[in-house]
Amino acid sequence: MPIIIDKDLPARKVLQEENIFVMTKERAETQDIRALKIAILNLMPTKQETEAQLLRLIGNTPLQLDVHLLHMESHLSRNVAQEHLTSFYKTFRDIENEKFDGLIITGAPVETLSFEEVDYWEELKRIMEYSKTNVTSTLHICWGAQAGLYHHYGVQKYPLKEKMFGVFEHEVREQHVKLLQGFDELFFAPHSRHTEVRENDIRGVKELTLLANSEEAGVHLVIGPEGRQVFALGHSEYSCDTLKQEYERDRQKGLNIDVPKNYFKHDNPNEKPLVRWRSHGNLLFSNWLNYYVYQETPYVL
């Protein structure tokens, strides 16, 4: 089933070339089925790339989705044209009186700061509070997951000696949770972060359930009561070349960055990346949409 997006959104052309079913708002309004309202709070500086990554995954489901892109009003985005934000994005103030079936909060390259040092932290706290009563289920990704765990449950993040960077094997810890329906017992997911949350801290919060972790990369998937909050510390939405682009960017900046682990063939950056997370990435997003959004949301929001 299609996702509904603005006909002029640049990501539309990318998605259509990949045979992802997208639909214009004009066409969708002629149908009698209610689309699921999904908001994406895009905290990444590479907004258009992140749009395509997430729309690619949520568009690969048998559900019609009405997607609303959000950006932070209290933060000046320097890596995206203001025209793009004006044309395709809303702020929290624009939608705070609405209800949504689902919300995705992305990662952000601010993890070395304390949460309170992030210039939009107060606005993000208001959005996370709003999500508790106005959103059926919220999916938090990477730093967005760390922020959600900290705000809702007081779970701290800790600096790593070296960046967790690469594609890592994870083990399913809870076999009978719908979010992991169809998952293999072992699966891969990318990570790209300088901080971590710790398993003992997660297990110390009775409302949280650890679903999957990695011996090397640590905590990956965590779920709150009734699936109202889902936390993914990795980046299952990443495209094939995202880690490569990050690696090359950091090298160009002169940073001391290791080759992403388990990513390039033979761990050689001159060779092609090996994609081993795509199927489980699709499964993660489709399970979230099906079991925690579509199956749980009321017809009238």
Swiss-Prot record:
Site residues by UniProt (Important for acyl-CoA specificity): E111
Active site: C142, H235, E237
GO biological process, one term: L-methionine biosynthetic process from homoserine via O-succinyl-L-homoserine and cystathionine
GO MF term set: homoserine O-acetyltransferase activity; homoserine O-succinyltransferase activity
Main location class: cytoplasm
Recorded GO CC terms: cytoplasm
Domain of life of the source: Bacteria
Subcellular location: Cytoplasm
Binding site for substrate: K163, S192, R249
Cross-referenced Gene3D superfamilies: 3.40.50.880
CDD domains registered for this protein in UniProt: GATase1_HTS
Keywords: Acyltransferase, Amino-acid biosynthesis, Cytoplasm, Methionine biosynthesis, Transferase
Enzyme Commission number, as recorded: 2.3.1.31
Enzyme type, top EC level: transferase
Chemical reaction(s) catalysed: L-homoserine + acetyl-CoA = O-acetyl-L-homoserine + CoA
UniProt-listed InterPro entries: Class_I_gatase-like, HST_MetA, MetA_family
Pathway: Amino-acid biosynthesis; L-methionine biosynthesis via de novo pathway; O-acetyl-L-homoserine from L-homoserine: step 1/1
Pfam families named in the record: HTS (PF04204)
Site, as annotated: Important for substrate specificity: S192
NCBIfam families: metA
Function: Transfers an acetyl group from acetyl-CoA to L-homoserine, forming acetyl-L-homoserine.
Family assignment from sequence similarity: Belongs to the MetA family.
Listed name of the protein: Homoserine O-acetyltransferase
Provenance organism: Bacillus cereus (strain ZK / E33L)
